[in-house]
Amino acid sequence: MERPDLKNPDLYTQQVPHDIFARLRREEPVYWNPESDGSGFWAVLRHKDIIEVSRQPLLFSSAYENGGHRIFNENEVGLTNAGEAAVGVPFISLDPPVHTQYRKVIMPALSPARLGDIEQRIRVRAEALIERIPLGEEVDLVPLLSAPLPLLTLAELLGLDPDCWYELYNWTNAFVGEDDPEFRKSPEDMAKVLGEFMGFCQELFESRRANPGPDIATLLANAEINGQPVALRDFIGNLTLTLVGGNETTRNSISHTIVTLSQQPDQWDILRQRPELLKTATAEMVRHASPVLHMRRTAMEDTEIGGQAIAKGDKVVLWYASGNRDESVFSDADRFDVTRTGVQHVGFGSGQHVCVGSRLAEMQLRVVFEILSTRVKRFELCSKSRRFRSNFLNGLKNLNVVLVPK
C-alpha cells in the first residue's frame, strides 16, 4: 500500500484526499505517519476513535508544553522568538482545569440568550451583503459574503468598529497560512503583520481594562485564571484564537457549501422548497465541508486507540475530515444530504475542546442560506477555487460563481 504523508500541505492543494482517508479507514484506521525528522504521529481516522480520544483530555493532552493542538510543517509557527514570547498560549492549547476556566470566561458572550439577541443584527448584515451582490453575473463570494459576514459578527462580539473587518481578515490569513506563500510571503512580511497586530492588541487590552464593556474583548482582558489576572501576552493568544476560530470555520463552511450546492442542485431545490430544513441542514454543511482538517493530541501514558498500542509521548492526530466521511456512521457519507438528521459530526471537534462558537457558526450558516433561498435559483460555479496550502484548514481563497436569480 502506498504510504501517504498526511502532514504534507501539498496533499490538500487540489482537494481534501477523501479517497486516501477512506482507504486508510478500511485498512489502517490508526495509521503511523513518519515525519522527516525521524519522528512521526498516529493518524486517527475513524469517527468512533476520534470521539474516544476527544473525551479523554488528560490522557490525550492538547497542552502547549506537550506539543500543542496541531502539527506544523517546514515553516513551523512562523514567528520569531520575540514573536513567540509576545503571543501567549491560547486556551485551545491548554488542558483542564485551566482550559475549563477560560471556557467559563468566554461562554457568557456565546450563551443561547446572547446569540438570540444578536441573530437579528446578523440577519440585517447578511441581507445587506447579499443585496450588494449582483445576480446573474460572475462574482467572487469570498470577499463579498463568506469572509465579511463572520468577521462583522466578530467585530460586534469584540466591541470593534465594523470597518476593521478587512484588517482582521488579512491578519488571520497570515496567522493560519504558515505553509502558504501567498499568505506568508517572507519573515520580514510576517514581522510587519505581527507588529501591526501586537499594537492593535495592546491598545485593545488597555482600553478594555480601563473601560470594560459587554464584549468578549473585555471578558478576555479582565479574566482571572488561577486567581491571577491575565497578562497581555495571554490576551493576545486568546484574541488570536477567537479571530481565527470565529472566522475561518464559518467562512469556509459557507464557501464549501455553495460549491457543493452548485454540484448537487437538487439539494438546493429541496432547501428552497423546505427552508425549515436549514435548522438541521447546517450540521450537514459542517460535516461535509470539514473546515478544520485536524487537531493534535499527545499521549500522556501508554494506552491504545482502536486496538493499536500507543506509547507515552506519542503524537496523535485526529483527522476530522476523515471522521466526518466515516461510512460506518454516515450512510452514503460522501453525499451532501440536507434531509440527513441527527448528524453527529466532528467538524467542530468533540469533548471538552469542542468549539465554543459552534452554535454561532451554525446560526450564521442558517441565516445566510435562508436569505439566499429567497433570491437565488441556483449556483453556477465558474472556475475551480484556489485552495489554502494547509493541512490544518480546509480553506478556499476565492469562490467565483454566478448567482442565478429566481
From Swiss-Prot:
Q: InterPro entries recorded for this chain?
A: Cyt_P450, Cyt_P450_B, Cyt_P450_CS, Cyt_P450_sf
EC number(s) of the enzyme?
A: 1.14.14.84
Q: Provide the GO MF annotations for this entry.
A: heme binding; iron ion binding; linalool 8-monooxygenase activity
Which cofactor does this sequence's record say it needs?
Answer: heme
Q: Which domain of life is it from?
A: Bacteria
Q: Where along this sequence does the record place binding of heme?
A: 355
* Main EC class the enzyme belongs to: oxidoreductase
Keywords, A to Z? Heme, Iron, Metal-binding, Monooxygenase, NAD, Oxidoreductase
- Known pathway: Terpene metabolism; linalool degradation
Q: Which reaction does it catalyse?
A: linalool + 2 reduced [NADPH--hemoprotein reductase] + 2 O2 = (6E)-8-oxolinalool + 2 oxidized [NADPH--hemoprotein reductase] + 3 H2O + 2 H(+)
Q: Which Pfam families match?
A: p450 (PF00067)
Which family does the similarity line name? Belongs to the cytochrome P450 family.
State the protein's purpose: Catalyzes the 8-methyl hydroxylation of linalool.
* Protein name as it appears in the record: Linalool 8-monooxygenase
Q: Recite the lineage of the species.
A: Bacteria, Pseudomonadati, Pseudomonadota, Gammaproteobacteria, Pseudomonadales
